[in-house]
């Protein structure tokens, strides 16, 4: 599950010259949800670490449009990789983490955006309103959480002002891990 929003950044439909989603910096105290334009991919298919992944604009080849907030399974279902589990015995067609292991459901979530300018003395905060279960968070080639974010739907806030770029697309990459001990479904 991934749910995040930016403080002091306002989503608007305008697009930059490069075709990137444009975040416009509003008045202090305002915030916006950044639920659109996310992409996901199984971590073991991405042949680079988060520093490299977030350092350059994303090549969306092989990436799935992702739902945020949402789960890895929600993204897989919405992209037609598995049938709707609420019908018949379709839930039996979805691989159980106990049988396939954690790597099967460890995914990267990425999002790109541009900003025109950051007013002097202003800060931009990235707020995660719940990640299930662990996450490593990167922006523009830098890891922004020193320690791996771990826990069920914990909230966490990061000042991302020093990492933002106004001269190139910003790339946010979040590596989401499922719980370490998944239990036995019996």
Sequence positions of predicted segments:
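Bacterial N-terminal signal peptides
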Residues: 1-9
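Generic cytosolic/nucleocytoplasmic N-terminal low-complexity/intrinsically disordered segments
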Residues: 12, 89-91, 139
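Boundary at the C-terminal end of the N-terminal hydrophobic targeting segment
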Residues: 12, 16-19
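Intrinsically disordered, low-complexity regulatory regions of eukaryotic regulatory proteins
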Residues: 16, 35, 76, 94-97, ...
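Accessory beta-strand-rich segments of carbohydrate-active enzymes
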Residues: 20-26, 39-45, 79-81, 85, ...
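Hydrophobic alpha-helical membrane-insertion signals
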Residues: 20-72
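Aromatic- and Gly/Pro-rich amphipathic surface segment
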Residues: 57-97
């Amino acid at each position: 599950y991934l749910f995040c929003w930016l403080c002091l950044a306002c989503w608007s439909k305008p697009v930059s010259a490069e075709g990137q989603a444009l975040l416009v910096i509003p008045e202090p105290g305002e915030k916006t949800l950044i639920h659109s334009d996310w992409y996901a991919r199984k971590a073991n298919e991405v042949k680079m670490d988060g520093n490299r992944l977030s350092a350059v604009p994303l090549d969306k080849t092989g990436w799935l449009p992702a739902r945020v907030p949402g789960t890895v399974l929600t993204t897989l279902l919405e992209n037609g990789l598995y049938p709707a589990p609420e019908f018949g015995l379709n839930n039996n067609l979805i691989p159980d983490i106990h049988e396939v292991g954690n790597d099967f459901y460890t995914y990267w979530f990425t999002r790109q955006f541009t900003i025109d300018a950051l007013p002097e003395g202003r800060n931009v905060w990235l707020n995660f309103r719940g990640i299930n279960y662990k996450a490593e968070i990167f922006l523009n080639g830098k890891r922004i959480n020193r320690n791996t974010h771990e826990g069920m739907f914990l909230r966490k806030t990061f000042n991302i002002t020093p990492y933002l770029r106004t001269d190139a697309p910003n790339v946010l990459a979040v590596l989401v891990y499922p719980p370490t001990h998944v239990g036995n479904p019996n």
